Amino acid sequence: MTNIRKSHPLMKIINHSFIDLPTPSNISSWWNFGSLLGICLILQIVTGLFLAMHYTRDITTAFSSVAHICRDVNYGWLIRYTHANGASMFFICLYVHVGRGIYYGSYMYTETWNMGIILLFSVMATAFMGYVLPWGQMSFWGATVITNLLSAIPYIGTSLVEWIWGGFSVDKATLTRFFAFHFILPFIITALTVVHLLFLHETGSNNPSGIDSNSDKIPFHPYYSIKDFMGFLFVFVILLALVLFSPDLLGDPDNYTPANPLNTPPHIKPEWYFLFRHAILRSIPNKLGGVLALVHTIVILIIMPLLHTSKQLSMMFRPMSQCLFWILVADLLTLTWIGSQPVEYPYVLIGQHTSMLYFTIILILMPLVSMMENKMLKW
């Protein structure tokens, strides 16, 4: 008798994706983050669903409904803080996942890579709209400032901003539509994730060495399922510690003040996972220039395959490229710190230099160093 997982039409799909999936025998823990992102997405959808049951998307009651969830709903505080800090864990996993893709040359699997960039855009949009929903000071002013960036688009900019707002300022209509989009986008992200996996399983996973591994593959279960489970436990413990001991560590104190259109906070800044983009945006004194730089922080990832000049896929055997990669990581961490600082000397100057370095490394130095390494290896 044939095993049900190999004969049943639905089980067969699950079997080929998660059980008998041929996987390179040498992939490291850096490959855990894809499955961790899946777990984070499920966690966000479940906690978000429970929050939506108690949240009211009206500017007069939104702030107090969040307070009601934390005070009066059974374990409401746990659900709310798991959702808020779960977003932070999501972005940590997301950035590590993208970083691993750059380090090991996974961007050469173009369909999977481009679908991943679409997913990154979608997750960023979802997180931004979710940050607006508590209707605190930083929610309101963050929404006002970020949506206002679209006014930099020539001719249609102002009309576009008013169309998104549903009026002449961020108001009731804005909150209602942001809630609607924030609710539906995670399900769209889930569908896009399935397509992302579909493209990945067409080509098979990359591996640290960057060479073809078709001759040396092992089944995903139990070898990697147990490894992924360890990753789940590790992230779950960190998230639980954050939620139970320091739930507001990554939040902004201004968001505990109800939104007031007549009182601007001294320093408007987004959540920590957008700070490096925020730093790049404000390092250019021109509005349109800043918006273009902001957009290109992600668009630059799309052209990564075109910038690949090395004869090797992975950076595993390329020490000079490795050095550049870790300088890029340090640069992004510096930009994150700069984004949290006020707009004054020396932070503006440091921000301008680090923004320039970010684009220089990816667009100029990485391709040049790769060509040098080819010469050194006489390729």
UniProtKB/Swiss-Prot annotation:
Residues that hold a ubiquinone according to the record: 201
Location of the protein in the cell: Mitochondrion inner membrane
Binding site for heme b b562: 83, 182
Cofactor(s) the record lists: heme b
Superkingdom field: Eukaryota
The UniProt record lists the keyword DNA damage: no
UniProt keywords, alphabetically: Electron transport, Heme, Iron, Membrane, Metal-binding, Mitochondrion, Mitochondrion inner membrane, Respiratory chain, Transmembrane, Transmembrane helix, Transport, Ubiquinone
SUPFAM superfamilies: a domain/subunit of cytochrome bc1 complex (Ubiquinol-cytochrome c reductase), Transmembrane di-heme cytochromes
BP term (GO), one: mitochondrial electron transport, ubiquinol to cytochrome c
Regions that span the bilayer: 33-53, 77-98, 113-133, 178-198, 226-246, 288-308, 320-340, 347-367
Major site of localization recorded for this protein: mitochondrion
Subunit and partners: The cytochrome bc1 complex contains 11 subunits: 3 respiratory subunits (MT-CYB, CYC1 and UQCRFS1), 2 core proteins (UQCRC1 and UQCRC2) and 6 low-molecular weight proteins (UQCRH/QCR6, UQCRB/QCR7, UQCRQ/QCR8, UQCR10/QCR9, UQCR11/QCR10 and a cleavage product of UQCRFS1). This cytochrome bc1 complex then forms a dimer.
UniProt name for this protein: Cytochrome b
UniProt gene name: MT-CYB
